[in-house]
Design a protein with these regions (language model features):
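Mature extracytoplasmic or organellar-lumen-exposed domains after removal of signal/transit peptides
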Residues: 25-423
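Bacterial N-terminal signal peptides
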Residues: 10-17
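Bacterial N-terminal signal peptides that target proteins for export
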Residues: 1-10
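N-terminal signal peptide c-region/cleavage motif recognized by signal peptidases
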Residues: 19-22
Length: 423
């Protein structure tokens, strides 16, 4: 198996690795992938449902700005992250999902592209000519000879800003752009506290920081666009849809995609880019949900999604339990000891993630945990990283056990070549 280098709303979690009886007849691989695709559809439907609730909460905030309506919109954003993060396991190994993902979950972002920033942010960047474009304050701007017309802030116009100038940090759409517009910058470093944007940033009658009408228009455009993007992915997982067709044509291809998703999210993306990099640098800018201090929940729900892809179990936002033929069932029929090992590793990771989340819910946010000198916090994060790395080794063994040939799992310099992080 090859590795390549690359780059409070915590769902109620119980241990997902339920016992599988040894010696049970193996399910048909096609049935396993059918259930895997059905769970994908359910997760994206749930992400869409909660995004629509977020959109409604944003409407209420804009219609009647207050601390209450701002808090409600923030809570709706956190709730929307739960099913979406559990869907991230479908990204790697499925090019349809991977090509779409950057529109909804790209990070980190240079927030000066969108709105006002603290003076400490600076006024220029060698790598980003749009670093302080502030399109909310500037309906028109000329950058590198190109005129940027943002007189109308609509889903189409902000979609055109995404990765402006081919700079990945120009994130204009998706969950994290919305997060910034609801919380504002987190100026606390590795100290306590999240972003603290006032509700008056959306109140034309008592406007703070100017341009309250345009800020509201941008927020509304971003939430409308998120709903539209999720509707697209729901359609892609319907029978015959583009993403569903990737996995359903050949069961072996589907199983490779499923295990690539589990391994790449476990190792390169979550353990590496989202966790170990920030821990090495002790840098809150490397925190996934950096404005809201919701990172612990996002990481936990990623881990839940990985376990779900293996066990075939998913709890929908309405409480419905989905179960069906699973990769775990396939492995148990071939190698019961390996299935027990795999489920045990998933349990260890979930326990570490839950411990980290409990620490955050108890008052020490993730950006504080990764702070330099916080030995206990660093250790809590490292325990979750270790669990993810360890479960990836078992995923590699599962690939061999079900005879899938070569599967590429994303790597990360943070894990494979830490010195390169400082170059």
């Amino acid at each position: 198996l090859a590795r390549k280098h690359s780059l409070s709303a915590v769902s109620a979690i119980c241990i997902l690795a339920f016992a599988t009886q040894s010696g049970a007849a193996a399910p048909e691989p096609q049935a396993v992938i059918r259930h895997y695709a059905d769970m994908a559809l359910a997760k994206y439907e749930d992400a869409l449902t909660t995004a629509k609730a977020l959109d409604a909460a944003v409407d209420a905030l804009i219609a009647a700005p207050s601390q209450e309506t701002l808090d409600a919109a923030r809570s709706a954003w956190k709730a929307s992250r739960i099913p979406y993060q559990q869907s991230e396991v479908y990204r790697f190994g499925n090019p349809v999902v991977d090509a779409w993902e950057g529109r909804v979950n790209a990070w980190p972002l240079d927030e000066g592209l969108i709105d006002y920033v603290d003076p400490a942010y600076g006024t220029e960047s060698d790598s980003n000519p749009y670093y302080v474009a502030d399109v909310i304050a500037n309906p028109s701007a000329t950058i590198n000879g190109e005129t940027l017309d943002m007189s109308e802030l609509t889903p189409d116009s902000i979609a055109g800003l995404q990765e402006a100038g081919e700079v990945e940090a120009n994130v204009a759409t998706g969950y994290h752009a919305i997060e910034f517009l609801l919380w504002g910058q987190d100026l606390n470093g590795t100290g306590p506290g999240a972003g603290n944007r006032p509700y008056t940033d959306y109140d034309p009658a008592n406007c703070t920081h100017g341009n309250c009408d345009r800020r509201a228009a941008y927020l509304k455009a971003a939430t409308d666009l998120l709903v539209a993007d999720l509707e697209e992915m729901v359609a892609n997982w319907q029978p015959g849809g583009a993403a569903e067709s990737v996995v359903m044509g050949d069961p072996k291809v589907g199983l490779r995609a499923a295990l690539t998703g589990m391994g790449s999210l476990s190792y390169g993306e979550l353990a590496g880019e989202r966790m170990k990099l920030g821990l090495i640098l002790h840098d809150p800018e490397e925190e996934h949900d950096c404005f809201s201090d919701n990172t612990h929940a996002s990481h936990l729900n990623d881990a839940v999604g990985i376990a779900s892809a293996y066990t075939g179990r998913y709890t929908r936002v309405d409480g419905t339990q989905m179960t069906g033929p699973s990769i775990s069932d396939l492995v148990a029929a071939k190698d019961p000891a390996l299935d027990t090992e795999m489920r045990g590793k998933l349990d260890v990771t979930l326990a570490a993630m839950n411990a980290m989340a409990a620490r955050a819910e108890g008052g020490e946010a993730y950006d504080q945990m990764i702070g330099e000198g916080n030995e206990a916090g660093n250790a809590a994060v490292q325990a979750a990283i270790d669990g993810l790395i360890d479960q990836t080794r078992s995923i590699e063994r599962v690939v061999a056990a079900v005879d899938l040939g070569q599967v590429e799992i994303e790597g990360s310099d943070s894990l494979d070549n830490p010195d390169a992080v400082f170059e």
